[in-house]
From Swiss-Prot:
A lipid is attached at residue 208 (S-geranylgeranyl cysteine). GO terms for cellular component: cytoplasm; cytoskeleton; plasma membrane. It is a lipid-anchor. CDD domains: Rho4_like. The keyword Mitochondrion does not apply. This is Rho-related GTP-binding protein RhoF. The gene is Rhof. It comes from Mus musculus (Mouse).
Length: 211
């Protein structure tokens, strides 16, 4: 314990390791858990098991800085709509995921997920992720979609949804084939760090104005 009147500990240098909290949301079965497991554990789950709430930790290098990512997987099912907001506290960024082969999960980006995130995480940046891109070439999946008079969601449609929700970035990935998986989290970390710097500059500016 510091003695009375002792000087406060020096502030951590700017090169200190950063920690970011990132929450991942999206419809149940859209691919968000597989994305997290491949990135953090290197393994793709062959069988779908609904998540409730799980935390994963990983490290990423942004520029010359090591950043710790605390990644929170959430339940997309309606049964958890009242519990899920507990995950949003003190988050730095939200990844909104959808399945490019499931038009309903795409529609829910703007119908459900964006409004929910905006309500509970006002001012927090979002990144939109199109998952399961490998299935765009899967003949059986295409047959099922077309039998229902539906088509896979295109990259352009994903980009349009991102623009409508004023997302910071739109990315696509295939967890099964590890395509763009690392890019998703590296770019998400960049967006979150940039938002933090901007908030700190604004805070300093307000302090200067008050003085």
């Amino acid at each position: 314990m510091d003695a009375p009147g002792a000087p406060a500990p020096a502030a951590a240098p700017s090169s200190a390791r950063k920690e970011l909290k990132i929450v991942i949301v999206g419809d149940g079965g859209c691919g968000k858990t597989s994305l997290l497991m491949v990135y953090c554990q290197g393994s793709f789950p062959e069988h779908y098991a609904p998540s409730v709430f799980e935390k994963y930790t990983a490290s990423v290098t942004v520029g010359n800085k090591e950043v710790t990512l605390n990644l929170y997987d959430t339940a997309g099912q309606e049964d958890y709509d009242r519990l899920r907001p507990l995950s949003y506290q003190n988050t730095h960024l939200v990844l909104i995921c959808y399945d490019v082969m499931n038009p309903t999960s795409y529609d829910n980006v703007l119908i459900k997920w964006f409004p929910e995130v905006t309500h509970f995480c006002r001012g927090i940046p979002t990144v939109l992720i199109g998952c399961k891109t490998d299935l765009r070439k899967d003949k059986e999946q295409l047959r099922k979609l077309r039998a229902a008079q539906l088509e896979p969601i295109t990259y352009t449609q994903g980009l349009n949804a991102c623009e409508q929700m004023r997302g910071a970035l739109y990315l696509e990935c295939s967890a099964k084939f590890r395509e763009n998986v690392e890019d998703v989290f590296r770019e998400a970390a960049k967006v979150a760090l940039s938002a933090l710097k901007k908030a700190q500059r604004q805070k300093k500016h307000r302090i200067c104005l008050l003085l």
